[in-house]
């Protein structure tokens, strides 16, 4: 049986509805999974009309009512948006609240095992906070409603997968957060994630923190005191892990296939190479757009995969948004759901 995925519509004023519709207009999406949207049916219908597609929107209240057939988009209709005051491309508290409610509903469905995984379209953090929901983003919402204490963000495209020792902290503080225990935790998380993608024995590369991985202590001590001891312990436990690899070469090697996953020491060390590979320049809009990047939250009891781009208010409602990242997100979530199901069956035998 194909896995059921709950896809959140994202901020209604952004490109979330459009990229969701585009992804669900692909027949191959229904060949690998059974998607159901948590959102507003009226907004999804607007997106269908905007794109001029021959699709039907099936407004439902539960997963049991979904048809799961190509040509029909099943939407658990939460009716969060007042169409009389709604506008594309603007920060609106009602849209921030709507995006929050869509996420909350998807989490509830996954925690109740009514769906096998979740995929999220982008939200706007300003709108979210104006609505009274004070979170940094999706990841923190998921952590709160799944009661998860240890988690990490993994970015991925077709070639590179990267997890971060730290993310949204000042760079000065990030250096202090490079600790043996956290490096070990990150390798464990990305190793498990790669296995969920069907990689039997993942080869994990761990980046150094300092230039040239400190050149035997010439440019810093974090490698010798924290990173190398973590790698040695992991190797003794049987992990196929290598490092510290100089930060200026690890991602080039990963892109060429040497590593199945990488551990970055801080936010920009991991984000910059991924976005160089995953983002394209759109000449029509004069903007950068995500062609293939996805964001996967590791450590949760449920599956969460997201597009690695924002709401793109500047192009919302124009019918030109690229759905490649959404399509890839659905693919990753499907593979993870199948892996977890097979693992559960194996454990029960």
Model region roles, listed by residue range:
Residues 140-149, 171-193:
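Active-site glycine-rich loop that binds ribose-phosphate moieties when present
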């Amino acid at each position: 049986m194909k896995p059921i995925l709950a896809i959140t519509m994202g901020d209604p004023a952004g490109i979330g509805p459009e990229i969701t519709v585009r992804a669900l207009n692909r027949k191959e999406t229904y060949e690998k999974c059974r998607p159901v949207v948590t959102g507003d049916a009226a907004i999804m219908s607007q997106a269908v009309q905007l794109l001029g597609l021959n699709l039907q929107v099936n407004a439902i209240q539960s997963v049991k009512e979904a048809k799961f057939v190509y040509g029909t988009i099943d939407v658990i209709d939460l009716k969060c948006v007042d169409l009389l005051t709604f506008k594309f491309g603007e920060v609106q508290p009602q849209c921030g609240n709507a995006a929050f409610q869509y996420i909350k509903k998807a989490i509830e469905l996954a925690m109740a095992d009514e769906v096998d995984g979740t995929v999220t379209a982008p939200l706007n953090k300003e709108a979210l906070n104006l609505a009274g929901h004070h979170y940094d983003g999706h990841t923190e919402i998921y952590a709160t409603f799944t009661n998860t204490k240890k988690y990490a963000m993994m970015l991925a495209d077709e070639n590179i997968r990267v997890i971060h020792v730290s993310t949204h902290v000042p760079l000065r503080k990030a250096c202090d957060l490079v600790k043996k225990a956290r490096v070990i935790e990150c390798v464990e998380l990305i190793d498990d994630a790669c296995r969920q993608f069907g990689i039997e024995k993942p080869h994990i590369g761990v980046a150094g923190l300092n230039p040239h991985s400190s050149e035997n202590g010439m440019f810093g001590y974090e490698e010798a005191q924290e990173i190398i001891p973590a790698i040695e312990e992991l190797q003794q436990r049987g992990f196929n892990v290598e490092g510290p690899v100089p930060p200026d070469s690890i991602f080039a090697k990963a892109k060429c296939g040497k590593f199945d996953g990488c551990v970055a020491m801080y936010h920009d060390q991991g984000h910059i190479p991924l976005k160089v590979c995953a983002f394209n320049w759109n000449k029509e809009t004069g903007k950068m757009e995500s062609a293939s990047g996805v964001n996967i939250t590791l450590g949760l009891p449920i599956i969460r995969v997201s597009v690695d781009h924002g709401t793109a208010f500047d192009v919302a409602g124009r019918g030109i948004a690229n759905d490649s990242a959404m399509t890839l997100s659905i693919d990753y979530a499907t593979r993870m759901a199948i892996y977890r199901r097979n693992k559960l069956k194996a454990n029960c035998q």
